[in-house]
């Protein structure tokens, strides 16, 4: 597994908000189009893992971009629409709960990231990836940035797109499976969700059977 050789996990100088400095450093080397990559949905008991890749226009950066976890749902929704309008290209890919169970969540998240880059309408010169790992088989050179969604606006944009996309998917799943309250917690292990799993059982294709407390207790 490739890891960024230059990025340190010990970050004492995180900016108050992500900026374009990481991208500018790469552009000074003649790399024109820089993609930000992030994912949403590593931890839930249900639903897919969703990854997004975003190439922003350096001359028309959306204002207010930040790590999706530091934004309200309403603000994420608003920024999502702005990103889709202003970005040069945006792509989303997801892997299902069954795919996650067939490998593991880390591999599934990295594979979703790889597929998201493939879906871009232009091939980026370089990718900035949130986390510690560059996805295997990435179609362009990449760098892993620990807490990248708080450092790079491109990664922050990808985090917003991935989060909003996944939340919308879980709202639809909630409508199809009312007892679980998926539209409220997006599949995370809330008390209500765990209680529903105990009373109703997990849903094949929706729940992750390799995740506790489901693992080993229910047949898929």
UniProtKB/Swiss-Prot annotation:
The record's annotation in InterPro entries points to:
RNase_HII, RNase_HII/HIII, RNase_HII/HIII_dom, RNaseH-like_sf, RNaseH_sf
Domain of life of the source: Bacteria
Q: Which reaction(s) does the protein catalyse, per the Swiss-Prot or TrEMBL entry? A: Endonucleolytic cleavage to 5'-phosphomonoester
Q: Could you mention a single GO BP entry for this protein? A: mismatch repair
Q: Give me the comment on cofactor binding.
A: Manganese or magnesium. Binds 1 divalent metal ion per monomer in the absence of substrate. May bind a second metal ion after substrate binding.
Give this protein's Gene Ontology molecular function annotations. manganese ion binding; RNA binding; RNA-DNA hybrid ribonuclease activity
Q: What class of enzyme is it?
A: hydrolase
This protein's major location comes to: cytoplasm
NCBIfam families linked to this entry: PRK00015.1-3
Report the HAMAP family cross-referenced here: RNase_HII_B (MF_00052_B)
Q: What is this protein called?
A: Ribonuclease HII
Q: Which organism is it from?
A: Brucella ovis (strain ATCC 25840 / 63/290 / NCTC 10512)
């Amino acid at each position: 597994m490739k890891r960024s050789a230059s990025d340190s996990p010990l970050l004492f100088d995180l900016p108050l908000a992500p900026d374009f400095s990481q991208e500018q450093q790469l552009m000074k080397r003649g790399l024109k189009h820089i993609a930000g990559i992030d994912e949403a949905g590593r931890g839930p008991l249900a639903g897919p893992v969703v990854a997004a890749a975003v190439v922003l226009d350096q001359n028309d950066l959306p204002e207010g971009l930040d790590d999706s976890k530091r934004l309200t749902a309403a603000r994420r929704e608003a920024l999502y629409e702005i990103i889709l309008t202003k970005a040069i290209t945006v792509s989303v890919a997801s892997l299902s709960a069954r795919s996650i169970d067939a490998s593991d969540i880390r591999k599934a998240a990295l594979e979703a990231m790889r597929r998201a880059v493939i879906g871009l309408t232009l091939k980026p010169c370089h990718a900035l990836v949130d986390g510690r790992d560059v996805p295997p088989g990435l179609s362009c050179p990449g760098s892993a940035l620990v807490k990248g969604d708080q450092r790079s606006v491109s990664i922050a944009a990808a985090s917003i797109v991935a989060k909003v996309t996944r939340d919308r998917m879980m709202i639809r799943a909630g409508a199809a499976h009312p007892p679980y309250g998926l539209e409220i917690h997006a599949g995370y292990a809330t008390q209500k969700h765990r209680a529903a799993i105990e009373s109703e059982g997990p849903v094949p294709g929706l729940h992750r059977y390799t995740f506790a407390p489901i693992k080993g207790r229910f047949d898929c």
